[in-house]
């Protein structure tokens, strides 16, 4: 599915750089003080990161996120945008652990990115989709201190959407370009070697093949293709979680 992508995170190069990048992407940085009040970011501090304890970016439930994203995919291909938004709120909250204000804002940005991408070329707006996803990744950076460059993460996100569209239309029957594009996004997000993320990318590509077949066969809700699609997404997230904790 477009975002979700839910593939995410990079490395923070410096505290001043983090604040500057956040402001460049349209959000003001700051710090959370011990007494719970927020300091301004004018002194070059690290982006304001909520005290979740262990990084929630690396402590999600593969079963929960996989099942939620499968439902998001169904809503996307049925163009049920209200349902897509409601489910995206749950995905963003469950997968990324942002506070509720950022969660709702992030889900809205994901919705708009998908709506801009959904029409077939030349009616689609890849640049607009990238702008929305850049702002989404900037929210993620404010929460978790990563990815290092939201604009780069957004480029990689929308790139795999592009590769999937080509694959979906049968212009390229090989899944390797899609696996490569997903691996690159995951590697950038988590700061790991691509080889460690390929199992997660391969399961995700398998899930996409199944949902594409489901679309071709009429998008029936009782289709036997939906359970294995959900299972492939769960396996993808399980492989991703295993890789980032290896």
What are these regions (language model features)?
Residues 89-114:
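Short, charge-rich amphipathic alpha-helical segments embedded
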Residues 36-47:
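Hydrophobic membrane-insertion alpha-helices, especially the h-region
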Residues 220-246:
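A cross-kingdom marker for long, charged
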Residues 133-217:
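Extended amphipathic alpha-helical interaction segments
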Residues 57, 95-102, 142-145:
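Flexible helix-coil transition and linker loops at the boundaries of alpha-helical arrays
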Residues 76, 117-121:
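Hydrophobic/aromatic side-chain positions at a characteristic register within alpha-helices
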Residues 61-69:
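Generic helix N-cap/helix-start motif at coil->alpha-helix transitions
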